[in-house]
């Protein structure tokens, strides 16, 4: 704790640390909402919670600055609750365990919640600071952003008013976001009748873990491996060359997180077991080479398990594995006018197969509506050809960059001395 509290600026990091101690996964925000309301009361600013679960602060202008434009500071209170498989953590009740690792602040075995805890911490620092000179300030801390922006969608017209809105859900210090991708969820489902396994076969549990994962919007262009896509590559080969059958598949656990772990159970003829085990080792080495310096913690293992009674039928298995193998994933293209910025991408987030049911979830993002639709249509075609029922949901529009925005030009002018220093 002491390490984090000593980081600069201390008035922001102290609030971020306090946020790590309040459970706040999407859908379970009662504790953080109560905490933020109490903070606002103690800071002496008007504070209330609206019907959508958003927290709003209003701070009057410094005397003499009442005629300045009203600035709205916006962030979201919820976090993505993702953990390593071996980590024991209850996101609804347990505090996070943050620590300093070199130049980074991390959490032990879980996501850190800096998205968007740092934005909320910055708002808290501004709200309690009595030395700042400012015009009228409004803070909007939204609920359940990570699962569908429900707080933002539920905000009623007239609840807040202002002239300039600054979104604090960004990544790097000294950088400004001047656009934002829209998004849409795609869910493909299928029910099937299981078939009995061959009693002469051997069952193997194949586990992929140790990947970096990450946020499927911010980090989609960082080259991180997708556990579901790697597993599809493995299965494609052992089905073709080792007569493998598929019993179950469980990969990823959050729609907006790049999957870092995946586990399948397969059966193979006894004569193929050693070949499959050797191929597992080969795959790990190939992937270590492909993702050198990126996925240094990758682990791909297999172990014998008891033979399950049932499995996925051959035709269904082939269709599912082929669709997941072929599904577009990662960056589609960058913004033509801002070449280093991702415009359109998708994340093959979760795969669940077993017990007569299959479900695949993909989240597509783009700052251009036509490209978002193009990408999702390609993905939908993939799974439709596999006989799956595909539903799109939760769509929201993107925000195309305006490099001539007056607010942007003002911020560039203000930050010029800092950037030159």
Regions inferred by a protein language model and the residue ranges of each:
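Single conserved hydrophobic/aromatic residue that forms the stacking wall/gate
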Residues: 412-421
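Short, conserved charged micro-motifs
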Residues: 67, 270-279, 369-375
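Fold-level recognition of mixed alpha/beta catalytic cores in primary-metabolism enzymes, strongest
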Residues: 134-227, 235-239
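Acidic/His- and Gly-rich active-site-bordering loop/insert found
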Residues: 2-103
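Active-site metal-coordination/substrate-binding segment of hydrolases
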Residues: 65-141, 145-147, 152-163, 185, ...
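Non-catalytic terminal/interface segments that mediate subunit docking, oligomerization
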Residues: 326, 330-393
């Amino acid at each position: 704790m002491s390490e984090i509290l000593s980081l600069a600026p201390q008035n922001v990091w102290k609030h971020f640390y306090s946020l790590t101690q309040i459970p706040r996964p999407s859908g379970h925000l009662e504790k953080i909402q109560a905490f933020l309301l109490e903070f606002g009361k103690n800071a002496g600013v008007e504070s209330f919670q609206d019907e959508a679960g958003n927290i709003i602060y209003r701070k009057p202008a410094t005397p003499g600055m009442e005629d300045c434009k009203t600035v709205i500071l916006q962030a979201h209170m919820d976090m993505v609750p993702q953990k390593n498989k071996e980590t024991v953590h209850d996101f609804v009740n347990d505090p996070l365990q943050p620590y300093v690792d070199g130049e980074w602040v991390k959490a032990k075995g879980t996501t850190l919640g800096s998205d968007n805890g740092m934005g909320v911490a910055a708002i808290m620092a501004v709200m309690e600071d009595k030395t700042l000179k400012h015009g009228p300030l409004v803070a909007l801390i939204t609920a359940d952003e990570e699962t569908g922006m429900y707080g933002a969608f539920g905000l009623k017209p007239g609840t807040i008013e202002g002239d300039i809105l600054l979104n604090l859900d960004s990544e790097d210090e000294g950088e400004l976001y001047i656009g934002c991708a829209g998004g849409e969820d795609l869910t493909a489902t299928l029910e099937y009748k299981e078939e009995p396994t061959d009693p002469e076969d051997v069952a193997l549990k194949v586990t992929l873990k140790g990947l970096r994962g990450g946020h499927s919007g911010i980090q989609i262009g960082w080259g991180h491996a997708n556990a579901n896509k790697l597993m599809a590559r493995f299965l494609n080969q052992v089905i073709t060359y080792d007569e493998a059958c598929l019993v179950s598949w469980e990969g990823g656990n959050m729609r907006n997180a790049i999957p870092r772990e995946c586990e399948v159970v397969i059966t193979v003829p006894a004569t193929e077991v050693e070949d499959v085990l050797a191929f597992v080792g080969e795959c790990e080495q190939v992937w270590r080479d492909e993702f050198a310096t990126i996925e240094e913690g990758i682990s791909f293992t297999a172990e014998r398990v008891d033979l399950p009674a049932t499995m996925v039928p051959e035709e269904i298995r082939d269709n599912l594995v082929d669709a997941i193998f072929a599904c577009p994933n990662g960056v589609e293209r960058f913004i033509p006018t801002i070449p280093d910025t991702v415009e359109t991408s998708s994340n093959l987030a979760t795969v669940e197969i077993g017990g007569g049911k299959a479900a695949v979830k993909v989240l597509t993002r783009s700052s251009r509506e036509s490209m978002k639709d193009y990408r999702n249509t390609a993905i939908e075609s993939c799974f439709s050809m596999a006989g799956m029922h595909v539903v799109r949901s939760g769509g929201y529009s993107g925000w195309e960059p305006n490099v001539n925005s007056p607010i942007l030009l003002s911020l560039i002018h203000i930050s010029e001395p800092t950037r030159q220093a």
